[in-house]
């Protein structure tokens, strides 16, 4: 165990996502200390060695070591990447039975260390497992965050930017709802340079509208395509996790589409779901309730109902 100085991030699960996330943290100089925890201690130790050998190339070298749950005591943030991976043909919700028991063990072990920081959950189905983390930890809702639709939103902005030939950073558009098959695009609030995207395609005819629909389908189904081609997704979500981590540790008050607990916003209660939220060192400062059109409201409620239906099998609602 290192002597805690500066910001400490504990990464639980050093598979594809966890290791890629630690690599992103190192390359961006986000954390001062990174501890890697995995049931396979040799894997965690090997990753720590590998990352340490690249310290000289990092913008802000971090202390990196493989550890155990006791190291979570002084962590500012515990990021859970452990669990069963999604296989070809599986939906994210198919993973619940496999991962819920794993999460109970992980969260209880973290809390037993005396941990008083924030949880960030990456494992799928992320909305369900973020709710489980909140329940198992008994922490305030704002201190438990899921990666939500941060990657879906990034995919959306990338594909829209590609279609309109502008930088994705200049595309303002959100994917909200379940990180999964019932997620939805908020077309009513999407714009590029202040011009609504719906207005941009008005003059281009029906084919342009169909292309927007195809873009959303490609966003929604991207994970299935990547899993089919290479077995897993990890680079994109690792960078998304790093972005959330920076917002937390650097107290940025950044608006990101994370899995946040709703207790009234969007007309929903007692569910973690992907929505824009203000993120800082205290966790979720507030949920941003963007104005949805009637069709989007119906779609969002269907998405929330899907998640609640799964939660009801494991937690009293």
Curated annotation (Swiss-Prot):
Substrate binds at residues 86, 92, 124-127, 152-155, 233. GO terms for cellular component: cytoplasm. GO terms for biological process: glycolytic process; lactate metabolic process. Allosterically activated by fructose 1,6-bisphosphate (FBP). Pathway: Fermentation; pyruvate fermentation to lactate; (S)-lactate from pyruvate: step 1/1. Its EC number is 1.1.1.27. It catalyses: (S)-lactate + NAD(+) = pyruvate + NADH + H(+). Gene3D superfamilies: Lactate dehydrogenase/glycoside hydrolase, family 4, C-terminal (3.90.110.10), NAD(P)-binding Rossmann-like Domain (3.40.50.720). Beta-D-fructose 1,6-bisphosphate binds at residues 157, 172. NAD(+) binds at residues 17, 38, 43, 69, 83-84, 105, 122-124, 147. Keywords: Allosteric enzyme, Cytoplasm, NAD, Oxidoreductase, Phosphoprotein. GO terms for molecular function: L-lactate dehydrogenase activity. It comes from the Bacteria. Its main location: cytoplasm. The modification Phosphotyrosine is found at residue 224. The active site is at residue 179. It is found in: Cytoplasm. It is an enzyme of class 1 (oxidoreductase). Signal peptide: none annotated. PROSITE patterns: L_LDH (PS00064). Homotetramer. Belongs to the LDH/MDH superfamily. LDH family. Catalyzes the conversion of lactate to pyruvate. This is L-lactate dehydrogenase. It comes from Bacillus caldotenax. The lineage of its organism: Bacteria, Bacillati, Bacillota, Bacilli, Bacillales. The gene is ldh.
